[in-house]
Regions:
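Catalytic cores of DNA base-excision repair glycosylases
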Residues: 18-20, 26-187
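Intrinsic-disorder/low-complexity peptide segments enriched for small residues
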Residues: 10-13, 55
Length: 187
């Protein structure tokens, strides 16, 4: 398979010989600056909109989320609006995303956040993990992207990159093993 970005491929090939975390991070940053996509949820620290994007991105292509996300946020701009909406309105707004159970979980989550937390998403990853539609990885993503807290998590796509470079011959690699090998010290 041919590489579209020759300079990156040469650097990646060198890196595979003796990968260091610092080299790897630099290379990923350089690649992102050159080829990263401008996505609306990357331009906010709002916990609600980050939560919506994280749940939408579960098993759904970025392009589809990119079109549905602004529509959903415009229709339900906060937890109170989502909690007050009818189930049929939420499912209708979700149409085309697949897995309607995610929309139903978001509605239930919004109701809980309004009832128990006054419409403010908790800053505790264990509480987040206990809410409908949120697993540990989503809780960590919210902690990192909304609250600026260093919580390590392995996203599916970057997981493949980590395994490719740091565990090229391994058949099965746990997230814990990846984190030990590649995670920078948390501040």
């Amino acid at each position: 398979r041919k590489c579209k970005h020759a300079s990156v491929c040469i650097s990646l090939t060198r890196l595979k010989i003796n990968p260091s975390r610092a080299q790897f991070r630099r290379l990923i940053r350089v690649y992102y600056r050159a080829h990263g996509r401008d996505l609306a949820w990357r331009r906010t620290r709002d916990p609600y909109t980050i939560l919506i994007s994280e749940v939408m991105l579960q098993q759904t292509q970025v392009e589809r989320v990119g079109t549905k996300y602004p529509e959903f946020i415009a229709r339900f701009p906060n937890f109170r609006a989502l909690a007050a909406a009818s189930v049929s309105d939420v499912v209708s707004a979700w149409q085309g995303m697949g897995y309607n159970r995610r929309a139903l979980a978001l509605k239930r989550l919004a109701e809980i956040v309004v009832e128990r937390y006054g419409g403010v998403l908790p800053k505790d990853p264990k509480i987040l993990d206990s809410l409908p539609g949120i697993g540990w990885a989503t809780a960590c993503a919210i902690m990192a992207f909304a609250y600026g807290r260093a919580f390590p998590f392995i996203e599916t796509n970057i997981r493949r990159v980590f395994i490719h470079f740091f565990f090229p011959r391994a058949r099965k690699v746990s997230d814990a093993k990846i984190l030990v090998r590649v995670a920078a010290p948390l501040d």
